Structures are given as structure tokens and as C-alpha cells.
Amino acid sequence: SGISHDLRTPLTRIKLQLAFIKDEQISKKLSDDVQEMEKMLNEYLQFASAGSAEKSEKFNLSDLIKNIIKKYENHNIVSEINESIVMHGRKNLITRCINNLIENSIKYAKKVHIQLNKTNNNNIIIIDDDGPGIDEKEYDNVFKPFYKIDKSRGGAKSSVGLGLSIASDIVRSHGGNIILEKSPHEGLRVKVFFPF
């Protein structure tokens, strides 16, 4: 699309200019930054196109989450998934949202706990981890696109990403809410509410 081309052109120009930088260390660092920007751009364009094309459907949220967790079998994930919780929404986007949240947790933690429960008017997904957590003052900021945390959870593995921003957009586009809290496992707790 035109937007995709407009966004990629400056990155292509930067990549061409990188070839002229003599200092290998600087060139490598800038090249890594450009690759990360390309990855984020692709991620966002995928999200934008999937969101506009996909129709809402009724699906089993319990089964969806169990299938997502299977992909992460090499990680220490403990789950308590209430059986047969059904929701109405855009299934691929919900999958994307949950993937982004799990990936954010496993990036920083040794152990991740995932729960799915139902209240009178919400399906609630809770993702806890035992990582370094996030300062309470940063809770709102981490949902902003490209926001980078200075320390703790923003250590060496930190990335200026769109994962949490996209997850938040998906939740809100379904009339839901996403909040962060301190986890009882010492790290971060992410609570996602999807209304019926």
C-alpha cells in the first residue's frame, strides 16, 4: 500500500547511507536499530491490515489460550484456564494480543502464570511473571508506541517496541480494558478484561 511504501522509503535510504560509515561498531549499532524499526513497522502494518479485514466471530477463548501456551512449551508457564469460556471478537487479533503479552512476560521472567476466569460481565485474562516488574509510574507509559523504560524491566533486553501498544489497542477495540499491577509473584501482573 501507499502508506507502507512511504514508511519504508526513509528506512531504505538510511540503510544505503550505513554502507558509507567507516566505523564498524557504529555501523553495526545503527544497522541493528534500523532492523528493529523495520520489524516494528512490519508488525504494525500486519496489525493494521488484519484488524481492518477480520470479522468478529464467536470462539472458545479457553481453547485459544491453551493452544497459544503450547507454542511456548520450552518456557516455564503455569496455567489455570477455566473450561469453555466463549467470547465474540476478532480471533486473530485476540491471538496476537495474548501472544504479545506472553512474549513480553517471558522476555523478562523465569516463570509465567496465566489464568482465565469469568465474572458476571467480563472474561478476565491474568498474566503474572516473576521478572523485575515495572515502576508504577510507568504503567500508563508502557502502552505508548515506541516507549522505552529506563531501568529494571528496561535492561539489556529492552526494546523500543509496539507489542504492548498493539495489545492495548486490540483490547480497547473489543470494548475491553487492560491494567497493570504488581504481581504476587514479584514481577508484573497484566489483567485483561473482555466484556461479554
Residues of each region from the PLM?
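Acidic ATP/Mg2+-coordinating residue in the GHKL
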Residues: 129
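Short alpha-helical Gxxx[C/S/T] motif in the catalytic ATP-binding
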Residues: 163, 167
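Conserved glycine-rich
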Residues: 175-176
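Short beta-strand/loop element within the Bergerat-fold HATPase_c
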Residues: 111-121
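Conserved catalytic submotifs in the C-terminal HATPase_c
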Residues: 78-89
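Short conserved segment of the HATPase_c
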Residues: 134-146
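A residue-level detector for a conserved hydrophobic packing site
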Residues: 94-98
